[in-house]
């Protein structure tokens, strides 16, 4: 079980607190995005020049779909929706998986896509999930995706009756590489936090 002190902030209960807590560590999204040289540079640039918040129909469809898919995962696998930012024993390693079983041994991650992933999920998502597995200590992740199709009126709707899933196990080699990325990111974050504190 994940100890209570590792549940840092709840996204739905207090978004600002959740967002603030994320700045004091390195998240799964950050590690996944920074795992290539170009991605690392882009993410570091964004620390100094945060992009303006934006939204689009693809993101809106993803938010709309996540609720029903979360309920399906709860009924099918006993994985409950999660909004908690969770830390590793090392508190700078953080993640907010989309779902968490009651015994904390299984997590889920939900995506929507315009193209079926088939039997191999995209590398960026695999890295994100591996980091979530490392942070939570879960035995595996039920990676879940729903196809997005466009209607004649230009609206998006689910393309399947039920989502598809793949069971993802931890990969020690992948995780070790992600730890290195996270440590390098954290060094830079600390530098920036220190500079901001001096102002």
Which residues does each predicted region cover?
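Short intrinsically disordered terminal tails
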Residues: 1-2, 193-199
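Nucleic-acid nuclease catalytic cores
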Residues: 59, 77-190
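Charged, glycine-rich intrinsically disordered N-terminal tails and low-complexity linkers that flank
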Residues: 1-64, 68, 76
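Generic low-complexity, intrinsically disordered sequence content enriched
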Residues: 17, 47, 77, 104, ...
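Short, well-ordered alpha-helical scaffold segments within catalytic/effector domains
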Residues: 66-70, 126-129
């Amino acid at each position: 079980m994940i100890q209570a002190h590792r549940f840092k902030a709840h996204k739905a209960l207090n978004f600002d607190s959740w967002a603030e807590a994320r700045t004091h560590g390195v998240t799964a999204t950050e590690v996944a995005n920074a795992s290539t040289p170009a991605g690392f540079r882009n993410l570091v640039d964004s620390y100094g020049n945060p992009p303006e918040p934006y939204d689009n129909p693809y993101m809106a469809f993803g938010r709309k779909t996540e609720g029903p898919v979360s309920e399906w995962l709860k009924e099918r696998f006993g994985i409950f929706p999660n909004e908690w930012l969770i830390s590793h024993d090392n508190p700078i390693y953080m993640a907010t998986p989309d779902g968490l079983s009651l015994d904390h041994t299984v997590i889920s991650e939900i995506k929507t896509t315009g193209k079926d992933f088939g039997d191999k999920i995209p590398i960026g998502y695999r890295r994100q999930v591996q980091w979530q597995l490392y942070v939570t200590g879960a035995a595996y992740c039920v990676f879940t995706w729903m196809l997005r199709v466009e209607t004649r009126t230009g609206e998006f709707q689910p393309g399947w009756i039920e989502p598809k899933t793949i069971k993802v196990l931890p990969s020690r080699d992948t995780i070790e590489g992600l730890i290195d990325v996270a440590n390098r990111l954290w060094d830079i974050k600390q530098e920036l936090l220190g500079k901001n504190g001096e102002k």
